[in-house]
Amino acid sequence: MHGHRASASAIHPDYPVTHRESTWRRATLIVQGSTATVDDTLRPAVPARGLQAAEIAREIATEIATAVAEVVTTVTVLEIDVTTAETTAAMTVETTAETAAAHVHHPVARGHRTAEMIVTAETTAGTTAGTTVAMIGTGVEVPRHVGQARDVLQPHRPRTSAATREERVNPEKQKEDKLAERAAKLLEWKKRKEAERLAQEKAGTPGSGASPAGSVPSTPAVAATPPPREAKPTVAKSKVPKPATEKVKQKQPEKSSFKLDESAAARPLIAKPAGKPVAIAAASKYHHIDYKCSNQLTQTDGAAAAATTKANGNIGSFGLKTKSTAEEDISSKALLDDEIDTGKRKLQALPVFATHDEPETTAGVEDDAAMSDIGTDDDETNAQLQAKLQSRRAELSHDQAADKDTNMEEVPTADNTGDQMDVDDNAGAEEDDVDPLDAFMADLSVPQQPSRAAPQGETMFNDDLEPEQTAVEGEDLLALRAAKKKKKEVPTINHEKVEYEPFRKDFYTEPAEITQMSAEDVADLRHELDGIKVKPDDVPRPVTKWAQMGLLQQTMDVFTRVGYARPTAIQAQAIPIAESGRDLIGVAKTGSGKTLAFGIPMIRHVLDQRPLKPADGPIGLILAPTRELSLQIVNELKPFLNASGITIKCAYGGQPISDQIAMIKRGGIHILCATAGRLIDLLQSNSGRVLSFRRITYVVLDEADRMFDMGFEPQVMKILASIRPDRQTILFSATFPKTMAALARKALDKPAEVIIGGRSKVAPEITQHITIVPPSYEKKIAKLLHHLGQTFSDDENAQVLIFTERQETAEDLLSKLFKAKYFAVNTIHGAKDQTDRNEAINEFKQGLLNILIATSVAARGLDVPGLALVYNFDCPTHLEDYVHRCGRTGRAGNKGLAVTLIENPGQERFAVHIVKALKESGAEVPDDLQAMANAFHEKVKSGTEKYYNVGFKGKGLDELDASRALDKKREKRALKLGDDDASDDEPDLPKLKKPEASGPGVAKSTNGDAAAEPVQDEPAWKKLLLGKIVVNKTERAETGKPTTAKERAMAAARKIDGNLSRKGTVHAGQPIDNKGPDAGLYHSTLEINDFPQKARWAVTNRTNVAKILDATGVSITTKGNFYGPGKEPGETDLPKLYILVEGDTEGVVTQAMLELTRLLTDATVAAEEAASTRGPTGRYSVMS
C-alpha cells in the first residue's frame, strides 16, 4: 500500500508545481452488501491532463485498498468530472482478505498541496466496521520524479477519525464504555504477564538474568541477520479465504506474546533497510492513527500493519510496487517481536487521546515507549534509543528485583530461539479480547519525552511572575531613600599639580584724550555719571564713548544697530577696569546696564585665547541666582557674541539634565551661563567627566548678594575653588551690604569697587507711593482693585507687576482678579514649573498679559521696558528687597511708579527701611509713615523691640543643612524609626515625655519640672500610613422595615453612627456609602485629604488607578470633599476626601489597599524631599 507515492508531475504532467490552491481530497467508502463504493471528490479539483480518468480511478482504488475481508469484496470508485460536475463509475477493484486493511494511510500528492483522504467502511447491518483518516502536511513542493516524492513529504498534525453512527447518537456513553472495557482487559492482561514472569523466575529460566551487554556490537549500523524459525517455515499463501476459527488460532500468538527474543536483546538496534520500506513505519512517520475502533476491525489490525512491500518487486503501470503472495503471507502472520523481518519493522509511539481519569503509566512504559521508536529513519534518534535500552538492560542484569514494573520480557537464550512458540488454544479463547498493541497504546497516557536532546521548556505560572505582595516597612523605605540620596559635593582640585595654559588679561589702552584729563576733570566726570565712587584710586578712568574702549568693529556695529548711543555710568567705569584685567565688584541700580558691563570685556578675553578643542570646556563662566536671570543674560549678550563668532549657552534647573549634558559634550561652548544648582549637577555627572574647568579664565557672579542669600555660598565657593586661582572674577549686584562684601572678597583678588548712586538706592525716575492700610486682607484687596482701576482707566494697555510675600497669596489674588473681570493675569513663583514660568514671563514681555503676580523670584532679572506700575501688595521686609522690587519699573531712563502697602499696626519695623530708601532716593517721606518709624524707634529705646537690618545676608548651607537634619530626625521619630544609621553630627531632638496616667486613684506629680515638654502629635497622614489595613464585609441594605423593638433600636444606632462619622475624618475600613445593591462583598476606605497634593494626585490619576483595577479587579471610587488645613467638615457636610475600595474577596481589596498605600508613601516622601531641597521660595527669614 505504501510502496509508492504519486507525485503531482506523475499524475498531472502539465500541472505546475507552484500552484497554491488547496486540493484536498475526500474519499468515502460506502459498503452496500458485498460492494464498497468510494466517492472521491476534489475541492478545488484539478483536471487530469494527459491521463485517462479510468487510470486515475484505478490508482486511487489501488492506493486506498480498503475493505473489510468479512464484508467487502469489491470497491467501486466514483470519479467527479471537474468541468461538467458529472459523477461516473470509473473503476471497480476487487479485494481479498489478504489485501484488505482496516486502517489505511497513504498520502497522494496533488500539485503543490497534498491530499486528505477519509475512508469510511460500513457493514450491511449499519454498524461501523472501521474508520481511517489519512492526513499529510501542506506546503510541500512535490518533485517531478516518483522516487523523490517519497522523501519530501512532511508530517502533519494527526486528525481524529470520522464518527460512527452509534457514536454520533451517544458519543460520550460510547467512549466511557470503551475506556472501562479496555482498562479492565489491560489490568487482567498485566496480571497474567506478571504471573508468567514469576513462573519463569521460579523455574530458573536464565533469559532475564543473563546480561546481554557483552554481546552487543559496537557498531549498531550493521544489522545481524536473524536465524530462521525451524517450526514455522515460510509458505506462500493463496487468496482463498480461510475459516474464521483457523484465523483466530493464527492470531492468538500475535496478541498474547508481546516479547523480545534473546537474539533481539543481544544485537544492536538497526534502522530500516533501504531496500524494503515498511508500511506501518511510513504511516507512523507522517500521521498518527486513531485506534478507537470495534473488535472486528481490531482483529484485522495485525495483518494490515505487518503488510510490507518489496523494493525489488514488480512495478505496476502506475509505479506501484506489487507484492508476491509469499511475502504478503509472511508479513501478515508475523509477530511484533518475531525474528522474521525484524530489521525492516518500525515501532513508534502512537498517542491515544485518553481522558484524565485513565490510570498513570507504570515504569515499564518507559521501555515500551523506547521500543516503539526502534527502526525510525532518524539515525540520531535510533542511537539514543539504543543507548537507553542498553542502559536499561544493564540495570536489569545487576538488579533483577528492581525490574518489577517492566512489562516486556526477554525470551530464553539461543537454545530456544529456533523453537516455534506454542499456541494455547484455551488461553487464546480467554485472551481473545486483549490485543498487545491496544494494551500498549492504552499505557501511553502520559506524553513521552522527545527522542532528541532538545532544550526543554520550563512551566511558568502567572503567579510566579507577580511580585510578592509584602508590605514594605517604613524603616526600609526611608533607609533606601537615604542610601540613594547623597549630598552634592564638588571634588577638590589641587591646583599646584595642574599645569594651566598662560593667558592674557590686560587688553585696555587708555585713550589720549582721557589720559590728558586732570584729576579735577576726572572727579567732575564721575560726579556727572551718577556719582561714581571707586576704590582704590589707581583704577582706570571712566570713558564717555564706545570708541574709547578699544572694542572690535563687529561690536561697534551691534551697538549702532541696537541704538545704544553712549555707555551708562556703570558701563563707562566698569568696562575699562574689566579690560585691564582686574577683579571687580560693581554695585549699581537696576536697569543701569550691568549685563553689558561684564559681557563686552568678555569678547576680547575669549578671542585672545586659542580655539576650543572638542574636549575643552568653556572659557567664560557666568553664575546667576535664578533661571529667569540666566535666560535674560544669554538673550542680551547673544547679539554681541554672535557677531564675533562666540557661542554662549545656558544651563539651569527645571530642564532635563541629559539634554544639557549632550550639549556640553558636543563642545564648542565659549561661554556658559548657569545657575549654581545645575552647575553642581553637571560637575558631578559621570564622576566629573562631563564639564571641565581647565579653560575657564573669566568668571562673573551676577546678582551675587541674592545668590549668597539663597544658600549657595558653599557651592559658589567650591565652584570658584575648582577654577584656576589666577582667573579674573567680576561681581555685580544692585545691592551690596557690608556683610556680603566681606564674603565676596574671599573669592576675589584685590578687587576694584565701583559704586553707582549709593549701595541701595531707588532710581530717581521712579515715583514711590506709600499707602498705609489696616491689617485686613479684604481691605488690601480693595486698595489693589482701586489702584488697578485708576491705572487702566488712564492707559488700558498698561502693564502691572504685583509682588506678594507668599505663593498662596499670589494664587489667591489670581482668583480674586479673575472674579473682578481681569482675565489677562498670570502668576510666577517657585512652585510652578519652569516651562510655565517662562511662558508667563514671555507673554508679559510681549504685552499679552496686563497683570503679572509674582513673588521675589521674579524681582531679579525681570526686564520689561514698558512696565508702568510695580505694586507691593505685601510690604518688603528689608531695604534691599524694596530696592529690587521698585527697580523693575523705570528702566532704561523711562518713568515708573511703585506703590507699596504697609499695615499699621503690625509692620512698624518695615517702615524704617522704607523711610531710609525714600530719603536716599530724594523722595518725600509721608508723615504717617515717619510716625510709624518714630514709634518703632521708641520701642527700640524702651527695649521692647530691636533693629533688624539684615538685608540679603549670606546664610550659607550650614544652617540649612542643620535645619533639614533636624526635620529628618523629627520625621523619624514620628514614623517610629530607629536611629541606627544616625550620624554623630546630626542634632539631637529633645526627648518626648511619656503621657502620665490620669484618673481616679492616680496621684499627679506636683513637681514643676515634671511638666516638661508637651507630647508631639503625629500628622494625620502619617498615622494613616502606620495604621493597619482594615477590610470589612459590606453591610447589605435590609429588605424590609424593622418590626421588633430591637431592630428599630439597631437601625437608629446605625443612623446616628453614620451621622457622627460624617462630621469627622474617615477611618480606615469605615463603611460609608457602600450599602447599595452594586456594592462589593468587601470594602475598605483610605482618607487622603491631609496628604500633600502630589500624594493625592498619585492615587487618583487615571493611569495609576487603571493599573490597580487591571491587577486586582476591584472598584476604586474617590468620595468626599477636600478641606484645607485647619478646616473641618460640618455636621451636614460631606466627610473629608477619601478613597473607597470595593471587591469580591478580601484578598483583592487588601492588595489594592497595599498598592494605594505604597503610592501615597512614595509621593509623600518625594514631596517632602522636594520641599526640603528647594529651600525657601519667595520668603525671607529674619535673623537676629
From Swiss-Prot:
GO terms for biological process: mRNA splicing, via spliceosome. Its EC number is 3.6.4.13. Residues 203-224 have a biased composition (Low complexity). Residues 148-178, 197-262, 356-377, 389-433, 973-1016 are annotated as: Disordered. GO terms for cellular component: nucleus. It comes from the Eukaryota. A motif (Q motif) lies at residues 544-572. The keyword Signal does not apply. Residues 780-933 form the Helicase C-terminal domain. A motif (DEAD box) lies at residues 702-705. One of its GO terms (molecular function) is RNA helicase activity. CDD domains: SF2_C_DEAD. ATP binds at A588, K589, T590, G591, S592, G593, K594, T595. Residues 164-178, 244-262, 392-407 have a biased composition (Basic and acidic residues). It is found in: Nucleus. Gene3D superfamilies: P-loop containing nucleotide triphosphate hydrolases. The keyword Ubl conjugation does not apply. Residues 575-754 form the Helicase ATP-binding domain. The Q motif is unique to and characteristic of the DEAD box family of RNA helicases and controls ATP binding and hydrolysis. Belongs to the DEAD box helicase family. DDX46/PRP5 subfamily. This is Pre-mRNA-processing ATP-dependent RNA helicase PRP5. It comes from Phaeosphaeria nodorum (strain SN15 / ATCC MYA-4574 / FGSC 10173) (Glume blotch fungus).
